[in-house]
A protein has these predicted regions:
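HhH-family (HhH-GPD) DNA N-glycosylase catalytic core used in base-excision repair
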Residues: 1-198
Length: 198
């Protein structure tokens, strides 16, 4: 696949761009994985997260939310001592906390996917102007979801982190219009065009 988005600069980045980024996620395990990875990325490059992704997966049992929600101090120490793993105790504790909050959303809405996709009426959003270089770090939608998640007890879910999550999990299609992925996603999923300020 020819990559026309400008940011994939390594083969690993390119594979992530081509086969994951922006493609709608409708299962809770992958939603939880992407949310955790975005939270871990705070202050780091995304390439760092991709390079450590398999180690992170192993540490968190492939993001089994029910398992992670029950982690104790012993698990935190295990993760902290894993070679190659990120050593931020606060972020590790936040993932455990977020797993518990994630479960509460599942209990209330039936699934996390039902909860988060309801914010876009179960459609992928396409914002006018984003593919012309006017892509924001956050927007009104990510700010609204961030506030709601924080109210529900989530941590490390600021508006910028949530905007990145919305892009990664396909609630927003921010591929460039000339990128093959842009049309692939639009043709396979219900979409709605938004103005830049919506």
């Amino acid at each position: 696949m020819k990559v026309t988005c400008s940011w994939p600069t390594t083969p690993l980045y390119q594979a992530y761009h081509d086969y994951e980024w922006g493609r709608p996620i409708h299962d809770d395990q992958h939603q939880f994985e992407h949310l955790c990875l975005e939270s871990l990325q705070c202050g780091l490059s995304w390439l760092t997260i991709l390079n450590k992704r398999e180690i992170i997966r192993q540490c968190f049992e492939h993001f089994n939310v029910d398992a992670v929600a029950q982690y104790t101090e012993t698990d935190i120490e295990r993760i902290m001592s894993t070679d190659g793993m990120l050593k931020s105790r606060k972020k590790i504790e936040a993932i455990i906390n977020n797993a518990q909050a994630f479960q509460r959303i599942q209990d209330e809405f039936g699934s996390f996917c039902e909860y988060i996709w309801a914010f876009t009426n179960h459609k992928t959003l396409i914002y006018e102007g984003h593919s012309e270089g006017r892509m924001p770090a956050k927007n009104e939608l990510s700010t609204r979801i961030s506030k709601d998640l924080k109210k529900r007890g989530f941590k490390f879910v600021g508006p910028v982190t949530i905007y990145s999550h919305l892009q990664a999990s396909g609630l927003i299609n921010d591929h460039g219009k000339d990128c093959p992925c842009f049309n692939e996603i639009n043709e396979a999923n219900p979409v709605v065009y938004m103005t830049i300020d919506d």
